[in-house]
């Protein structure tokens, strides 16, 4: 506004003065505005320049016909503070302008209810605000900042903030006009029940542009309240205004409001109309607006009660704020149009109408909404044109109408997961044209219709939709009509009826409507249960479905056809004739209206109601399964045979259209494998439990095979009864065993069934068969034990048939008594037991005394067999010689087997007596094992021995060769030991020349008690070898030839001691001592004879030959006697071998040496020690004739732990220890100084060339010299160790022949053996005499000894150097090598390891 003629005044609260001439110039301003107002002339334009400062004082100016411009220097500089007690002005018919200033803290009281406004009250005036701030003004009535009545109010770039009133917090416009541009209304407030937190308009016109309304609060209409008038708002924002109703604005009484390009964000209402509330024909239009997060519990955006249109054009709706409805139409004839809008992420029902309303949606899109889009009722009409619904996931219907009409054209429903797209009820009509529905997941169907409807579908595509629970496209109760033309249905899936799903109507409306299809293509539609296209649920009325020009392509249902219905009727399948208590299987088939099975469902059940005179057991209710049938299983009916019972069947919860079904059942007699039994007035047909035919056939076949084997075994035993292997086993014994086994096998067919006859004879047969076998075997084992005992006591050992039969008769007394009692006195009878649960009956054999029979029989058998086991243990160490049949071993195993079988079988058979199959298998398997073990252990080995005689002889020959190798190996080891005892031999030879060799007292002292005891045991064992044994045998005609052996004869001795037994004679035994003394007395007499024989056999023996002793010590005599005894017994009782060397072969024999007494350092007496000497006697002039050559006999005894050599050949150096010699065998065994040397000696078990490590010999020589020096200092106090002492090993145990038997002459069974022994003794005595003669000749030339190893070591004064020692050793070994070549025995290879001990010769070893 321009002032042509104006008055200008200046006012300054700080520089102004109070004078008459003030204010006319800027330099002399007035201090108070009121002084200027008094000077102003009405209707004269006046400018009042308000200089910087805060103006306070008394205002409330009354201005009429004033034209004034209040101009300040800025809103922050020029401030009019009304101090909360006054208004600034009350103006009428004036034109007041405010610019660049702030008016605050105004307060207005209503004057007679007319004058309101906290800062300004204007009437018939014009008020202009330019860059004005109206702040913190309050009015007790209306218009917290300004009240305008019939005024024009222009606002530019101004601020209304924190103004309060009972209504119109910012200002009130009454019958006025206002233009607001670029202004802000912030935090204005209305109290009590007022309206319009920022502006209240009464029948006025207002235009708002580029303004902001934010955070204004009022009970109603949070920002703008409009009662009549027009409001146009452009490019403005309404943000977070708050009220109870109409959070942004409220329109009442024919208001017309247009918002263009506005934003409505976060406006809230406590009740409804979060953004706007419309009543009374108010029209609201939004164009290009944005709605976001507006909220109210009932209606979030607009609630309309106006019949005027509500229009949304090109708007966007977003916001995830929970609310019931976004846009609501509550009055009749409301109209809503949504055009080209986009809705996304909206909660609550988007559009709701509960009355006769019209909703039009044109070219809009809906996505990601969380509730229904349209929900209308009461004849509301919905028109959707060219709109899309996609990516919506809700558990609601997208469009729901009740008694309304739905029309859609060019609509797309894609990728939605909803309860249904369209829900129409109560007479609704649905018309869809040229639309598409694809890739949707629906819980019920795409279109759900009920309670009177009509649906028309034309030119639509329904593809790839999935129905989750019912159908897929249309779900209807068949109370309306369906018309579908020129459409495509492809790849739709649902459990039932993908195209049409007819459910049961909820009302009594007629279902006589038609379903018409024309020009339809049905392709690849699929039903997971029934109805590939159409399905009728629950009760079905007469369907009237027609399809004209329809094409069906690959439409399938898992449990149905193209058209199926729910349950309609059922049929019953049952056996009309049954026997009492038969397992009855009843099957019911559920059918649909079209006669197809109702499959794929289990919501139907059936009851069976029996007749009153029959007994019923089982479940009388069955549930329909997926294959369309219900089965009653485990039902048992029982009644008197030839009676009839009626069974009635009915369905629940759906009653069949045909009603219940009754079927008669006839009872017959039992079948062949069952027995009729009445228990507690109930008839049962019980199944007989018995052994299956297959088991009978299998076990019977095995028994027959065993019977054939037994017969063949008996035939072979009789045919070869004169053979020693059969004869020694006693053919009668074998026949009794065969008879017992055959009787035992007869039990198996008796066990096939339990009848009175089989029960009576079953137990006696078992007792007789088993006792015959076990008693015979026990008597055999007992006789073996007695045989061993008789041999030890030198009694009669022959076994006679009479003896066998006598004891079998004795042992069979108790079994015969048991048989008589169980067969005649208290026989077992057939009994039975039944199982009502399994409907079975079991026959078994039992009696009151049955358990007593079993216990007595078991105790008796166990007593015999356990005693037999004891006898087996006692006799376990007795084994047969190689090449003989050891029957005792097999008898022992057989007794063990019988014991185990009877211990296991009898108790188990009693426990399972009432189980036919188990009882039969236990008995049958036990009998088969019993008989089979008897055949395997008693007959097969004998037949095998008969057929494999040559193989056994070859095995023996190989065994003897191995023993020869061990003998030669022991000889070489003894040679090695002799090298370190050579020094001691010189002293011993001197003692021999003094005649101390025959000192019996020293010999007696040298023999240990343990040696004597072991010798006595071996004597007894050898007595057993000389005895006859019926359990062991060998072929007397078989002779094993060997190039190195003269002869080998097997003897039938089989009960020999084990290989672990000792063979040294016991010198404490009086029998042995008496025999020993007798041999010593006769030794002198034989000496001359032996000397002559030796001279005759070696006439040209040179003097240089090593001399043999002229006489032997007691130990040598004893050994000679033992050797003689062993040689004599080798032909009759034990296996021995004789090696006959060639004519020029040197003879290996021990040199008899006398003991020598050594006194050193005074009168102390020395101890005597006897050390044998082992030499190879080379006789180059010995004739080649075998008769004149002395024989080297190596008797072999299988009882000894090591090889047994006669004392004429080998004496042990291990039992000799001299105080003069620093090295003994004991030293080698125990000395730590020699441990390295011992460990460096290595023995090779193979027979090859002999080698020695000189490093080992050097170490041994050095240790020998060191120990000699040490022992020389202790010679005066040392004593000689006795021969065979307990502290050192006694080699006499290994070489003493244990075959000396002083009681041989007293045994009448051994007369022949004694004669043979005497002959052998004579031969051995001749050999001894020859050896003694050689020894005498050699002794006579001892001083003139030949240059051999012994002559060199006799020179005491010669210093023994290492070189001499090695030379002597090599000379000695060279002679040994030559001797072995003459005997055809390869030398032993001795390497750097420890020298092994003497290896035992064990003839008990067998392949």
Swiss-Prot record:
Residues 718-731, 780-806, 875-890, 941-1407 are cytoplasmic. It is found in: Membrane. One of its GO terms (cellular component) is G protein-coupled receptor heterodimeric complex. Residues 1084-1093 have a biased composition (Basic and acidic residues). The keyword Cell cycle does not apply. PbH1 repeats lie at residues 93-118, 129-150, 254-279, 452-476. GO terms for biological process: gamma-aminobutyric acid signaling pathway. Residues 1-696, 753-758, 828-853, 912-919 are extracellular. Keywords: Coiled coil, G-protein coupled receptor, Glycoprotein, Membrane, Receptor, Repeat, Transducer, Transmembrane, Transmembrane helix. The chain crosses the membrane at residues 697-717, 732-752, 759-779, 807-827, 854-874, 891-911, 920-940. InterPro entries: GPCR_3_C (IPR017978), Pectin_lyas_fold (IPR012334), Pectin_lyase_fold/virulence (IPR011050). It comes from the Eukaryota. Residues 1315-1344 form a coiled coil. Residues 991-1004, 1030-1040 have a biased composition (Polar residues). Glycans are attached at residues 43, 58, 162, 179, 182, 230, 241, 270, 368, 391, 464, 512, 539, 544, 554, 571, 627, 646. The keyword Secreted does not apply. GO terms for molecular function: G protein-coupled GABA receptor activity. Residues 991-1072, 1084-1248, 1267-1351, 1369-1407 are annotated as: Disordered. Residues 1005-1029, 1041-1071, 1099-1147, 1154-1246, 1276-1339 have a biased composition (Low complexity). Belongs to the G-protein coupled receptor 3 family. GABA-B receptor subfamily. This is Metabotropic glutamate receptor-like protein P.
């Amino acid at each position: 506004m321009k002032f042509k003629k104006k008055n200008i005044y200046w006012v300054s609260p700080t520089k102004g003065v109070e004078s008459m001439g003030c204010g006319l110039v800027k330099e002399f301003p007035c201090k108070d505005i009121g002084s200027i107002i008094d000077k102003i002339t009405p209707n004269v334009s006046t400018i009042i320049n308000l200089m910087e400062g805060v103006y306070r004082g008394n205002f409330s100016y009354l201005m009429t016909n004033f034209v004034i411009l209040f101009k300040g220097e800025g809103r922050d500089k020029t401030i009019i503070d009304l101090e909360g007690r006054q208004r600034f002005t009350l103006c009428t018919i004036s034109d007041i302008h405010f610019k660049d200033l702030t008016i605050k803290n105004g307060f207005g009281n209503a004057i007679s209810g007319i004058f309101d406004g906290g800062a300004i009250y204007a009437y018939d005036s014009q008020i202009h605000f330019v860059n004005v701030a109206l702040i913190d003004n309050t009015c007790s009535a209306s218009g917290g900042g300004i009240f305008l009545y019939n005024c024009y109010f222009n606002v530019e770039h101004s601020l209304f903030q924190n103004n309060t009133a009972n209504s119109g917090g910012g200002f009130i416009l009454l019958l006025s006009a206002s233009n607001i541009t670029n202004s802000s209304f912030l935090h204005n407030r209305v109290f009590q029940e007022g309206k319009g937190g920022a502006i209240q308009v009464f029948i006025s016109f207002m235009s708002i542009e580029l303004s902001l309304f934010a955070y204004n609060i009022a009970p109603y209409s949070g920002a703008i309240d409009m009662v009549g008038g027009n409001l146009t708002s452009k490019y403005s924002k309404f943000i977070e205004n708050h009220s109870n109703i109409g959070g942004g604005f409220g329109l009442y009484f024919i208001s017309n409001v247009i918002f263009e390009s506005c934003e409505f964000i976060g406006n809230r209402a406590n009740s409804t109309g979060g953004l706007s509330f419309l009543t009374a024909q108010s029209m609201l239009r939004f164009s290009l607006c944005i709605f976001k997060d507006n909220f109210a519990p009932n209606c979030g955006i607009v609630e309309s009660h106006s019949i005027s249109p509500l229009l949304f054009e090109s708007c966007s709706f977003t916001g995830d704020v929970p609310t019931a409805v976004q846009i609501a139409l509550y009055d009749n004839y409301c109209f809503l149009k949504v055009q080209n809008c986009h809705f996304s992420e909206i909660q609550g029902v988007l559009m709701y109408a509960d009355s006769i309303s019209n909703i039009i949606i044109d070219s809009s899109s809906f996505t990601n909404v969380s509730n229904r889009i349209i929900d209308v009722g009461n004849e509301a009409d919905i028109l959707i044109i060219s709109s899309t619904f996609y990516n919506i996931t809700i558990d609601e219907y997208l469009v729901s109408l009740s008694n309304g009409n739905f029309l859609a054209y060019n609509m797309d429903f894609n990728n939605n997961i909803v309860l249904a797209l369209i829900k129409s009820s109560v007479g609704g009509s649905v018309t869809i044209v040229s639309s598409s529905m694809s890739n949707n997941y629906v819980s019920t169907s795409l279109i759900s219709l009920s309670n009177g409807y009509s649906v028309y579908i034309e030119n639509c595509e329904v593809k790839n939709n999935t129905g989750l629970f019912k159908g897929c496209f249309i779900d209807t109760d068949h109370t309306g009509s369906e018309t579908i033309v020129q459409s495509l249905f492809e790849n739709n899936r649902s459990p039932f009826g993908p195209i049409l799903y007819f459910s049961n109507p909820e009302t009594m409306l007629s279902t006589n409507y038609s379903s018409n299809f024309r020009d339809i293509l049905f392709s690849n539609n699929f039903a997971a249960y029934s109805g590939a296209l159409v399905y009728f649920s629950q009760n079905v009325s007469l369907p009237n479905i027609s399809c004209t020009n329809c094409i069906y392509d690959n439409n399938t249902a898992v449990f149905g056809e193209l058209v199926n219905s729910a349950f309609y009727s059922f049929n019953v399948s049952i056996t009309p004739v049954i026997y009492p208590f038969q397992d009855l299987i009843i099957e019911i088939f559920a059918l649909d209206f079209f006669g197809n099975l109702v499959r794929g469902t289990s919501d139907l059940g059936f009851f069976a109601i029996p007749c009153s005179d029959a007994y019923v057991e089982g479940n009388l209710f069955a549930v329909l399964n997926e294959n369309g049938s219900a089965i009653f299983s485990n039902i048992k009916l029982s009644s008197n045979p030839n009676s009839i019972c009626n069974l009635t069947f009915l369905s629940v919860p759906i009653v069949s259209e045909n009603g219940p079904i009754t079927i008669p059942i006839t009872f017959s007699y039992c079948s062949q494998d069952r027995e009729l039994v009445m228990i507690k007035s109930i008839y049962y047909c019980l199944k007989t439990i018995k052994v299956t035919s297959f088991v009978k056939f299998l076990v019977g076949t095995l028994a027959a095979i065993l019977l054939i084997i037994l017969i063949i075994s008996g035939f072979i035993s009789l045919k070869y009864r004169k053979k020693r292997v059969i004869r020694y086993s006693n053919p009668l014994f074998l026949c009794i065993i065969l008879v017992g086994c055959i009787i035992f096998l007869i039990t198996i067919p008796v066990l096939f069934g339990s009848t009175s006859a089989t029960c009576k004879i079953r137990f006696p047969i078992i007792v007789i068969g088993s006792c015959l076998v076990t008693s015979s075997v026990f008597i055999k084992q007992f006789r073996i034990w007695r045989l061993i005992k008789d041999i030890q006591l030198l009694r009669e050992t022959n076994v006679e048939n009479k003896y066998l039969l006598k004891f079998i008769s004795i042992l069979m007394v108790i079994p015969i008594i048991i048989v008589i009692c169980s067969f005649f006195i208290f026989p077992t009878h057939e009994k039975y037991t039944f199982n009502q649960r399994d409907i079975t009956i079991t026959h078994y054999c039992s009696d009151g005394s049955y358990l007593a029979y079993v216990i007595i029989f078991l105790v008796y058998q166990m007593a015999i067999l356990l005693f037999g086991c004891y006898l087996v243990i006692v006799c376990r160490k007795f084994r047969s010689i190689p090449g003989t049949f050891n029957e005792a071993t097999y008898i022992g195993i057989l007794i063990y087997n019988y014991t185990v079988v009877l211990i296991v079988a009898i108790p188990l058979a009693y426990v399972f007596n009432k189980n036919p199959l188990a009882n039969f298998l236990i008995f049958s398997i036990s009998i088969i094992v019993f008989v089979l073990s008897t055949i395997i252990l008693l007959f097969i080995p004998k037949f095998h021995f008969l057929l494999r005689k040559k193989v056994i002889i070859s095995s023996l020959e190989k065994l003897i060769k191995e023993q020869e190798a061990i003998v030669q190996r022991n000889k070489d080891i003894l040679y090695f030991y002799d090298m370190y005892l050579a020094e001691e031999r010189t002293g011993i030879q001197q003692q021999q020349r003094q005649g101390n060799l025959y000192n019996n007292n020293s010999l007696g002292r040298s023999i240990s008690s343990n040696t004597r005891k072991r010798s006595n045991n071996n004597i007894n064992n050898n007595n057993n070898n000389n005895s006859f044994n019926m359990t062991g045998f060998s072929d007397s005609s078989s002779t094993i030839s060997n190039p190195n052996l003269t002869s080998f004869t097997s003897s039938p001795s089989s009960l020999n001691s084990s290989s672990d037994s000792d063979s040294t004679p016991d010198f404490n035994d009086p029998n042995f001592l008496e025999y020993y003394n007798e041999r010593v007395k006769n030794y002198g007499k034989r000496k001359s004879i032996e000397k002559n024989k030796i001279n005759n056999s070696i006439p040209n023996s040179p003097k240089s030959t090593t001399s043999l002793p002229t006489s032997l010590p007691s130990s040598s005599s004893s050994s000679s006697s033992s050797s003689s005894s062993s040689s004599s017994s080798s032909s009759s009782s034990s296996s021995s071998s004789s090696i006959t060397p060639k004519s020029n072969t040197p003879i290996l024999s021990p040199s008899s040496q006398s003991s020598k007494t050594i006194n050193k350092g005074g009168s102390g007496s020395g101890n005597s020690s006897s050390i044998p000497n082992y030499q190879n006697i080379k006789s180059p002039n010995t004739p080649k004739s075998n008769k004149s050559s002395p024989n080297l006999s190596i008797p072999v005894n299988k009882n000894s732990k090591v090889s047994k050599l006669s004392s004429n050949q080998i004496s042990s150096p291990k039992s000799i220890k001299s105080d003069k010699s620093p090295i003994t065998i004991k030293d080698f065994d125990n000395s730590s100084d020699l441990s390295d040397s011992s460990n460096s000696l290595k023995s090779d078990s193979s027979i090859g060339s002999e080698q020695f490590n000189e490093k080992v010999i050097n170490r041994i020589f050095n240790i020998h010299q060191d120990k000699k020096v040490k022992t020389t200092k202790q010679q005066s106090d040392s004593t000689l160790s006795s021969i065979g002492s307990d502290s050192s090993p006694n080699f006499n145990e290994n070489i003493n022949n244990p075959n000396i038997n002083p009681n041989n002459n007293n045994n009448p069974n051994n007369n022949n053996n004694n004669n043979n022994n005497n002959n052998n003794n004579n031969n051995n005595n001749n050999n001894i005499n020859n050896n003694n003669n050689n020894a005498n000749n050699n002794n006579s030339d001892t001083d003139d000894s030949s240059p051999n190893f012994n002559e060199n070591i006799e020179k005491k004064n010669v210093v023994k150097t290492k070189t001499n020692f090695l030379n002597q050793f090599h000379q000695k070994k060279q002679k040994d090598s030559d001797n072995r070549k003459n005997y055809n025995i390869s030398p032993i290879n001795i390497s750097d390891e420890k020298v092994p001990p003497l290896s035992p010769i064990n003839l008990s070893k067998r392949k």
